[in-house]
C-alpha cells in the first residue's frame, strides 16, 4: 500500500485487529521510507441501493454522509465512534436485507433516527428536529413526551 505522506510503495503492517462490530479490519502500517505510521481499514464492499431524493434525483449511497449526519447529531454527546460505526453498519445491513435497488431518502432518514434513538435520546431529538423540520417548540415537546411514555421514569439530574 502506498504511503499517504511520501507516496512510497513499501509499507509494513505493524498491527491488525478486527473492529468492535466485526465489520472491518483495522491495520496500523509503517512506511519503510519515511517511517511514519498510518491506519487503514479493510471492509467488505457492498452493493447498497441508490438513494432517491425528494426531488426524484438519484445518488449513490454514501456511508460518509450517514456517519457525518450522525456525528453532527451526537456532537458533544458521550457516544464512542465505534458505536456510530456499528449503527451505520446496521443501517447498511437493513438496506441490503431489503434486496431493493433503490431506497427513498425518507426511509433512510427513518433508519438513522431509529439508530440514534438507541444511542442517545438528545441526538435523536436533534436529528428529528432537522429531519422532520420542526417549526415550533410544541413539536420538540411532542417528541420528548413520546420518550417519556415509551421509557420508564428516571430520576432527574440536578445541575
Curated annotation (Swiss-Prot):
One of its GO terms (molecular function) is DNA binding. Its cofactor is Zn(2+). Keywords: ATP-binding, DNA-binding, Metal-binding, Nucleotide-binding, Repressor, Transcription, Transcription regulation, Zinc, Zinc-finger. It comes from the Bacteria. GO terms for biological process: negative regulation of DNA-templated transcription. Residues 49-139 form the ATP-cone domain. Binds 1 zinc ion. Pfam families: ATP-cone, Zn_ribbon_NrdR. PROSITE patterns: ATP_CONE (PS51161). Signal peptide: none annotated. InterPro entries: ATP-cone_dom, NrdR-like_N, RNR_NrdR-like. A zinc finger (unnamed) spans 3-34. Negatively regulates transcription of bacterial ribonucleotide reductase nrd genes and operons by binding to NrdR-boxes. HAMAP family: NrdR. Belongs to the NrdR family. This is Transcriptional repressor NrdR. It comes from Burkholderia ambifaria (strain MC40-6). The lineage of its organism: Bacteria, Pseudomonadati, Pseudomonadota, Betaproteobacteria, Burkholderiales.
Amino acid at each position: 500500500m502506498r504511503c499517504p505522506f511520501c507516496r512510497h510503495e513499501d509499507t509494513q503492517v505493524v498491527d491488525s485487529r478486527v473492529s468492535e462490530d466485526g465489520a472491518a479490519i483495522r491495520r496500523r502500517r509503517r512506511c519503510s521510507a519515511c517511517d511514519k505510521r498510518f491506519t487503514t481499514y479493510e471492509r467488505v464492499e457492498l452493493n447498497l441501493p441508490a438513494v432517491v431524493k425528494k426531488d426524484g434525483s438519484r445518488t449513490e449511497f454514501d456511508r460518509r454522509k450517514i456517519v457525518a449526519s450522525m456525528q453532527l447529531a451526537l456532537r458533544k454527546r458521550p457516544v464512542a465512534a465505534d458505536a456510530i460505526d456499528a449503527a451505520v453498519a446496521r443501517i447498511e445491513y437493513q438496506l441490503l436485507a431489503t434486496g431493493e435497488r433503490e431506497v427513498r431518502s425518507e426511509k433512510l432518514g427513518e433508519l438513522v433516527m431509529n439508530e440514534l434513538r438507541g444511542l442517545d435520546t438528545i441526538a435523536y431529538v436533534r436529528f428529528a428536529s432537522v429531519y422532520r423540520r420542526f417549526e415550533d417548540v410544541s413539536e420538540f415537546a411532542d417528541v420528548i413526551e413520546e420518550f417519556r411514555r415509551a421509557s420508564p421514569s428516571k430520576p432527574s439530574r440536578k445541575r
